[in-house]
Design a protein with these regions (language model features):
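N-terminal low-structure segments adjacent to metalloprotease catalytic domains
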Residues: 1-146
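Hydrophobic helix-coil surface modules that form long, contiguous segments used
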Residues: 141-144, 149-164
């Protein structure tokens, strides 16, 4: 998998699942174009994140990142278009989710985190191959979606449509 570098003085190595730089402690995440992991600075006044190379653009952590720490996606707030009255702020990858596990069961969260990591890697690879990536909201007939559900008999793993 491709690695990335922080823009801090140490040019710290960043990995695909990195959520902070171990050298400078800045928040890092997958950018909104879904092609690189890079650092973000937080602006207390606006309550938003920004990139040093693009300071005018405002970013926010994906809700699944901010609330459950299951992804490291960042969302460009200037490009955000609410879908069907849904006020969730979701990154590129999380917009492909149709079903997530029952999050009232705390044991599901680390399992969902593993599934999300695998999904992001798969989407990243498909994008790198220049394959079309459209979710069900964008293309109801042919769009790609992910349903992460629990197995009815065993509570220690998830089942996706790909398992069938």
């Amino acid at each position: 998998m491709k690695t990335f570098r922080c823009s801090c003085d140490n040019k710290q190595l960043l990995f695909f699942e990195s959520s902070s730089c171990v050298s400078c402690q800045r928040v890092v995440g997958l950018d909104d174009a879904f092609d690189k992991v890079e650092p973000y600075d937080f602006d207390e006044e606006s309550g938003c994140y920004f990139k040093a190379r693009r300071p005018a653009a405002r970013y926010q952590k994906c809700d699944n990142n901010a609330n459950y720490n299951v992804c490291n996606g960042m969302v460009n707030l200037d490009d955000l278009v609410p879908e069907d009255g849904n006020d969730e702020v979701l990154c590129f990858a999380c917009r492909f989710n149709e079903t997530v596990p029952d999050l009232s069961i705390v044991e599901h969260i680390p399992l969902w985190q593993k599934m999300e990591a695998a999904k992001r890697r798969a989407l990243y690879t498909l994008k790198a191959l220049s394959l079309p990536l459209r979710n069900l909201r964008q293309d109801p007939e042919n769009g790609l979606s992910f349903d992460f559900t629990t197995d009815r008999d065993v509570n220690d793993h998830f089942v996706s449509k790909l398992d069938y």
